[in-house]
Amino acid sequence: VAFQVTSSSNECAEIKKHGLHNLQWVLSNDTTLNRFLKNNNITFDIESKLMYINDIAYDVDYEKYNDLDVISKRKEQLHKIGHKIYYDFQINAFLFCKDIYDYSTIHEAPEFLYTLSLLNKATKEIDLKWKNICKPYVVKFKSKLKDFAYFTFYGSEREYIKDRQDNWLMLSRLVDTFFSRTSWTMLPYVENHSISV
């Protein structure tokens, strides 16, 4: 059993109906978050890697910003937004967490909104607007260890392939993390694009 910490303005009705989905799907479909962003004049064209704020287009192809020697504050934020959408877009969950309130503010608003809020004046405090209309929830779901991305448990894909048969390394990392007082959080990345709850 894994769990996702989220926030919702409709008592998770959308999640109950459609399940959990990755960020790309959420920004491409008629979802509560997507409608909220549109009401705040923010839209996304995922395929073209563009974000529109008040009809001004912003390039969020994070790979374009990777090798720049000098990067402006705005380009750095666009890189971070693009990174969330095109690299770190999967469903995130916890296998265990000692205290979710110590982990971050994800119980108040999606991390993506916080990243977005740092871009410019038009997006400033978008995360606080969301927080003011939503309540926090914990959504539990069943998932097999094979459903999690290899980098949840392994330092490299090679390490994963080597351990795939017996999973001893993965299991030892799970046990070590569970019993460690210093890192009592295990945050897996779910490879599926959606999860039924």
Predicted regions, residues:
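Conserved NAD+-utilizing ADP-ribose enzyme module
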Residues: V1, S9-I15, S28-N41, Y86-F89, ...
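ADP-ribose/NAD+-binding catalytic cleft of ART/PARP-like enzymes
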Residues: V1-I85
